[in-house]
């Protein structure tokens, strides 16, 4: 069992608190052999975050640059990052409670669906939304995740393959026309492969730029915190996580806003 599955089990030892996401979720869906970091979506409650920090404390984890694992920041869409050593392996863990591009209703549905699962993991459809990042490689992953879906509506909205979309349009022409309002490039699905591929490329660039703008808003808001972080990191070096957390939280107050001025992008 990988360390990331072990951690997932520990996080959820006495109740569902953490759902495996991002690269490790891609591994669990058998679309990758490995991923170097671990990402989780956490329940947004002080009790859940306390439990996660306790697990990390037992692993002798330390904070990396990011927001404190505190509900005041997490509800603003910030992320928290930690690291620990396991023999020769450097284990990095990343956490959010409000992942990008998932609505509140969709996130609530994810928690309902994963209740009782042996290994809670983000499903392919939602994972495809999370993978709409500014990294080129993630769009190939979205394409493969879409091929795991059975619902033609979801396939139309997420597929990255011109060939797949044209085949779908031949099978479901009315649905393709209906969904063209939500995804305009579907208007090209009955034309040429070249036109549809060009539309897919343009859409990918648009999605990448949108995520770049989202990240820039957080980076700009975090500039005072980033400036002070080296001193904070030196202050907490060698401290147990439970003590380091108190220091990080106290130092972040007033430097890192709980929420962005215009809300979560």
Question: How would you describe each model-predicted region?
Answer:
Residues 1-265:
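Compositionally biased terminal segments of proteins
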